[in-house]
């Protein structure tokens, strides 16, 4: 199994895009990238806009090779929209290049809130027009040669009852290698994502960590992440919301100490790529001080 991190906060953008290739199938998880329109009262710095375009280019390249593309949920950093956006580095045809003719495993709309259901409607219509094969993933399992792709049942995006909606997680089983992709569970702060991980027992676990930049139950997240460490994965990748604060390592220090004692590597998308972390959003204020630039605001409306 080969794994290539594509976009994520440690790589300078909002995303969890990940490319996975086995002997049988090529999967592009959550082919999206976006930037926070405002953080610290500032719009994205030009370096962030440049990075979003670079990540989008890599997503386009890898989508061309992929057999399967996932949409774990309908937040704009996890899919490619059907309309132009500076913050998502798209024009009106980008989605066709990403999804056209592909098999797309996507979150069912059955238990979504109104906002997510609306985005699902727009995206599913666009993907149908692009000739994609749409398969609702929740609780499903697919075999491609010797590789098995599993999807979790619907999970909360954060705490139970969250207004941010629901997601599905995925696992790829390829012989002795088992990868779990568990996006946007924000900790996990609830036990259900941990139950899915215990079912999969991954050798590599990619988990959407707690939003360290917001008031949050960090203790619950660390407790659940310790349970993941107890499954003895070779690598636990802490990703996404956790890395929107420059002091995220300090806030998760008990997890690092626990994992080190048990021989589990805590990694980021950047470290898996063999590059240094660039938390561009977390350092936006410093970027404007260090590299002064006009603060350009782009008014965008979702179609």
Swiss-Prot record:
Any one GO molecular function term: hydrolase activity
InterPro entries recorded: RibonucZ/Hydroxyglut_hydro, UPF0173_UPF0282_UlaG_hydrolase, UPF0282_hydrls
Cited PANTHER family: UPF0173 METAL-DEPENDENT HYDROLASE MJ1163-RELATED (PTHR43546), UPF0282 PROTEIN MJ1629 (PTHR43546:SF4)
Family indicated by similarity: Belongs to the UPF0282 family.
Protein name: UPF0282 protein PAE3680
Species whose genome carries this gene: Pyrobaculum aerophilum (strain ATCC 51768 / DSM 7523 / JCM 9630 / CIP 104966 / NBRC 100827 / IM2)
């Amino acid at each position: 199994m080969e794994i290539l991190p594509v976009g994520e906060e440690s790589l300078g953008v909002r995303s969890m895009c990940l490319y996975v290739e086995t002997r049988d199938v090529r999967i592009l998880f959550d082919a999206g990238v976006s930037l926070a329109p405002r953080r610290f009262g500032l719009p994205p710095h030009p370096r962030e806009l440049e990075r979003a375009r670079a990540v989008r280019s890599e997503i386009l390249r890898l989508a061309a090779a992929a057999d399967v593309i996932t949409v774990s949920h309908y937040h704009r950093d996890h899919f490619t929209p059907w309309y132009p956006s500076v913050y998502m580095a798209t024009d009106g045809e980008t989605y066709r290049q990403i999804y056209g003719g592909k098999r797309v495993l996507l979150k069912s709309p059955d238990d979504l809130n109104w906002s997510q259901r609306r985005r699902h409607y727009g995206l599913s219509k666009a993907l149908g027009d692009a000739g994609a094969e749409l398969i609702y993933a929740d609780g499903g399992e697919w075999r491609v040669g010797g590789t098995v792709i599993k999807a979790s049942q619907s999970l909360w995006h954060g705490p139970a009852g969250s207004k941010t909606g629901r997601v599905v997680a995925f696992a790829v089983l390829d012989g002795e290698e088992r990868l779990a992709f568990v996006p946007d569970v924000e900790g996990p702060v609830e036990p259900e994502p941990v139950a899915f991980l215990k079912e999969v027992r991954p050798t590599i676990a990619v988990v959407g960590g707690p939003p360290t930049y917001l008031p949050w139950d960090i203790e619950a997240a660390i407790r659940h992440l310790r349970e993941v460490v107890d499954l003895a994965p070779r690598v636990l990748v802490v990703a996404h919301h956790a890395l929107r604060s420059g002091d995220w390592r300090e806030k998760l220090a008990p997890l690092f100490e626990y994992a080190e004692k048990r021989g589990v590597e805590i990694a980021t998308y950047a470290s898996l790529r063999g590059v240094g972390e660039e938390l561009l959003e977390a350092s936006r204020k410093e970027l404007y001080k260090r590299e002064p630039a006009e603060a350009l605001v782009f008014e965008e409306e979702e179609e």
